[in-house]
Regions:
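Loop-to-transmembrane helix entry
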Residues: 1-9
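Intracellular helix-loop hinge segments at the cytoplasmic ends of transmembrane helices
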Residues: 73-81
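Multi-pass alpha-helical transporter architecture, strongest
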Residues: 47, 129-154
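Helix-to-loop junctions at the C-terminal end of transmembrane segments
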Residues: 14-27, 113-114
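A late C-terminal transmembrane helix in Major Facilitator Superfamily
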Residues: 81-117
Length: 154
């Protein structure tokens, strides 16, 4: 439970830090960079699962932080572009899109675990981490396109 508590607290801090980073550096830019960092850390994590446990856990801890860095920034971005009377509806749609991503991600990870021979095999978990990284790559691409569309200024 101590490890899970540390992951949760680090994720909460990362979410706040990510939102703060976006204030002065551009939301799309930061989320795009964080998404690509998540892809890289997911790939590295998939390669070190067979390493000593402290190395694998360290990489997975960093991956957790990378994943959480953009959550506050995405929510703050939704609130900042919503009109006064539309915030509730826009946040509801934002939440639904997030849950839809989660509902697609879990079966994709499960499928990779099955294809890899089951949850007790490291190579199956490596594939699962790569699938999670693919989700981060998709978010990074969407944000990068938005950043380019806004002239690299947002």
């Amino acid at each position: 439970t101590g490890l899970v508590s540390a992951l949760t607290l680090a994720g909460m801090a990362a979410s706040i830090i990510g939102a703060r980073l976006c204030l002065g550096n551009g939301r799309h830019r930061i989320i795009s960079f964080v998404g690509m960092a998540s892809v890289i850390v997911a790939a590295v994590s998939s390669l070190v699962l067979g390493a000593p446990v402290w190395i694998a856990l360290g990489c997975l801890f960093i991956y957790n932080v990378c994943i959480m860095l953009d959550s506050g920034a995405l929510t703050a971005g939704v609130v900042s572009v919503a009109g006064e009377g539309d915030r509730g509806a826009l946040l509801a749609v934002h939440s639904m899109v997030g849950f839809a991503g989660g509902s697609l991600g879990a079966p994709a990870v499960g499928m990779m675990l099955d294809f890899g021979g089951g949850g007790d095999r490291l190579d199956a978990w490596s594939g699962a981490l790569l699938i999670m990284g693919l989700g981060s790559a998709l978010v990074a691409l969407i944000q990068w396109r938005a950043w380019r569309r806004h002239g690299f200024a947002v």
